[in-house]
Amino acid sequence: MDGFSNQNTRFKTLVYNANRDALKLAPDKPIFSKTPFSAILPLRRRKLNTPSSLIIGGGIVGLATARQLLRQHPGADVTVLEKEAVPGQHQTAHNSGVLHCGLYYTPGSLKARLAVEGIREMAEFCDEHKVPHEICGKLVVATNDAEVPRMDKLFERGQANGLEGIEKLNRDQMHEIEPHVGGVAALKVPQEGIVDYIAVTAALVKNIEKMGGKVILNARATRFHEGSEWTVETPAGDFSADWIINCAGLHCDRVSQLAGQKRDLRIVPFRGEYYRLKPESRHLVNHLIYPVPDPAFPFLGVHFTRLISGGIEAGPNAVLAFAREGYRKTNLNVRDLFDALTYVGLWRFALKYPKMCVNELRGSFSKKYFSKQLQKLVPEIQPSDLETGGAGVRAQAMSPEGGLVQDFHFARGTRALHVLNAPSPAATASLAIGTEIINQLELN
């Protein structure tokens, strides 16, 4: 997953104050507009009447989709409805900022294709808009001999996904890159990187408004009416358009249900918690250090992530959150918790992975246990090297059978498209996801 780290305050500072000049935002023009606009969206050029679009959700996927629509169809009527006072406050703002190159994903899947396309597009976007980013590379470490065959299969998967330059390293070669890492072998993945997704979000908003689009804040979608066009009720007013595109992230299943879709999948919120290495311990990690995935478990496991700001994060675990926006252990939303605990899929998931669920919970309350998991990658790590970091919540779709939906998942409705599963690597792939959404709309 793209990791988690709470950066909401920094985002507000970035958008409203510090980086106006860096992002070339005109001081006399508001970054976020309060009113919609009208234009024509030529999704199918052969049609006489081309549709306007409302995008529900102003996270990085919703904003990237709006930007791609406006780039492909200049002058289009595109409005983003965001429920918060600042865009991108949830998954986007609680993101450690990894640029995923597509190594882990099944060849031919949407995740594989869109991650490979998306990292290239995101790097180009960052270059164009002067967004801080770095292609720093990653090591995927086999911690024992039993993991080497899985590492070899991962190497083959990376090649199948079109990744160039990945290498198998023996122990000595591995230690030349990461002297403190444990294990017996590793994959060197040069394409992987890090980025400031908060700055990406601010640049996307500027780009959208420059092209004539609108981002409406404090506009939670509360009701949907389908007639000759869609009308969406929000506290900021009612908005109408021919098409709706649901990019509501943690609430995408509920938004789709409001719009008349059957809720076949459900978002089950898993909180990922991080520690950070103390400044005096950061020398232990030079790059991104990841484990070889265990196919017996649905989550990747803890790893080390360099931050574009200079720190090192370690984690995450994966525990059930008691609120869809529950970034702290004490956060509780009765509706969200009831929604999760009454879902048969969650209980079937827990029965499939009882030991994993217990261990993930142990890591949430025990720094000593958490550090033991990290020691598999960097044996020198001690609990004293760690300080509490950020956390975030995955918008992970789960089936009634208790399986995590492994690929990006879109559902079509009447003049509607719903993004119902977009966890990692969705931030990396957001621009490519936007293009994919447009392609699906044009085929509908």
List each model region and its residues.
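Short beta-strand to alpha-helix junction loop
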Residues: 106-117, 141-150, 188-207, 361-366, ...
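C-terminal catalytic lobe of FAD-dependent flavoproteins
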Residues: 349-444
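Helical element adjacent to the flavin cofactor pocket in flavoenzyme catalytic cores
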Residues: 187-242, 431, 435-440
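Flavin-binding catalytic cores
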Residues: 262-264, 281, 307-309, 314-391
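Dinucleotide-binding Rossmann-like beta1-alpha1 core, especially the glycine-rich loop
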Residues: 97-173, 183, 301-302, 313, ...
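Glycine-rich FAD pyrophosphate-binding loop
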Residues: 70-92
